[in-house]
Amino acid sequence: MDETSPLVSPERAQPPEYTFPSGSGAHFPQVPGGAVRVAAAAGSGPSPPCSPGHDRERQPLLDRARGAAAQGQTHTVAVQAQALAAQAAVAAHAVQTHRERNDFPEDPEFEVVVRQAEVAIECSIYPERIYQGSSGSYFVKDSQGRIVAVFKPKNEEPYGHLNPKWTKWLQKLCCPCCFGRDCLVLNQGYLSEAGASLVDQKLELNIVPRTKVVYLASETFNYSAIDRVKSRGKRLALEKVPKVGQRFNRIGLPPKVGSFQLFVEGYKDADYWLRRFEAEPLPENTNRQLLLQFERLVVLDYIIRNTDRGNDNWLIKYDCPMDNSSCRDTDWVMVREPVIKVAAIDNGLAFPLKHPDSWRAYPFYWAWLPQAKVPFSQEIKDLILPKISDPNFIKDLEEDLYELFKRDPGFDRGQFHKQIAVMRGQILNLTQALKDNKSPLHLVQMPPVIVETARSHQRSASESYTQSFQSRKPFFSWW
């Protein structure tokens, strides 16, 4: 996708100077004649004694041999410096191009993390593949080796042609009729991840780690053999023939587009904590915190119609109070209230273009939890109802999602309208459930609704919508 974005224009393809700008990171070998070579490259000072214009007849034979050797060393170092300069210039231009793509002026904190990841990759601290899951995903690190984000490339998704997980390839080969989810748009998982973060921020839920679309290239990503051979060939050409290598649009591996989600520390799988809370019940105030956080997860999953929400792909962070059993009676101990938070990750299988109606229903597994039987609290009503009841807010949300989704090369406007129709129906059901004081369990039992834009031959200032219920149910229904 990046073959058409030249890194070095033909006008800039002249051989570079031998001297480097400060901070380029290049170092010249300390060899005899180095100072003479730099002076000659700069075009200042008299010609060295071994230059062709010097009267060699007056030199002793030993000095002539030394001069010829120094000239040969100077030429070798000059060629090496020229290759290093060309490589540094191309690399700097490539980094600048990636940074222009990965520009997030509206979120400077997120941009700082992306810059840290880019610098780490330049320093050969590459992302590490995550072996769990059904797609190619990677822990992205900073220059200190700390995990700062999770990157999921588009072409390594479960339906991508470069998915490194052989189990999905085997499933696609042996059982194609059961492969994939026909209610989802193929190869848009990275947009679904970023879209879930967008919805989370618009609704002020604050449970999805910030996620955006980012371009990254790394040796540890899964590339085709052709891409790797082309990259090695271009690098070899740049080293051997810098004039030719400078004319390539790109030297390294092609950058991959994908979702870049900030890494959250101190969280564990919800299944771990939920089992522990069954054995060790939480205090009343802490249990109230968990319930409020759980309601935010329900709101997010229901609006985006997440088709892959189990208890193993959302996280809980529980900061237990200080254990003062080992403290003496005379010690003063600061007792703090336990803090519990929820993080909704793995949102790549959301935003369907229709409600599931084929084989599987893809239920919300949190609906079987005890927290799902408690009616929605007044706090979540005050937070969500004013927003989702406002047509202007819904319209702004749709426009923001459109600006995000249209970045995909395979974007289809008709499919996007279907995705939005499903989301409108989910918002309609959620609004009614909150007003009727229902519980999350009652919410998921409501009939699926699709709200489409009504077609009219007359122009009007406001849009009208048509509401329809889905009567067809999946073969394996869960109610």
From Swiss-Prot:
The lineage of its organism: Eukaryota, Metazoa, Chordata, Craniata, Vertebrata. Residues 165-178, 268-276, 359-368 are annotated as: Important for interaction with membranes. A lipid is attached at C174, C175, C177, C178 (S-palmitoyl cysteine). Pfam families: PI3_PI4_kinase. Residues 31-45 have a biased composition (Low complexity). Belongs to the PI3/PI4-kinase family. Type II PI4K subfamily. It is a lipid-anchor. Detected in brain (at protein level). Its main location: Golgi. Residues 130-136 are annotated as: G-loop. Associates with the BLOC-1 and the AP-3 complexes; the BLOC-1 complex is required for optimal binding of PI4K2A to the AP-3 complex. Interacts with BLOC1S5 and DTNBP1. Interacts with ITCH. Interacts with FOS; this interaction may enhance phosphatidylinositol phosphorylation activity. Interacts with ATG9A. It catalyses: a 1,2-diacyl-sn-glycero-3-phospho-(1D-myo-inositol) + ATP = a 1,2-diacyl-sn-glycero-3-phospho-(1D-myo-inositol 4-phosphate) + ADP + H(+). This is Phosphatidylinositol 4-kinase type 2-alpha. Coiled coil: none annotated. InterPro entries: Lsb6/PI4K2, PI3/4_kinase_cat_dom. It comes from Mus musculus. The modification N-acetylmethionine is found at M1.
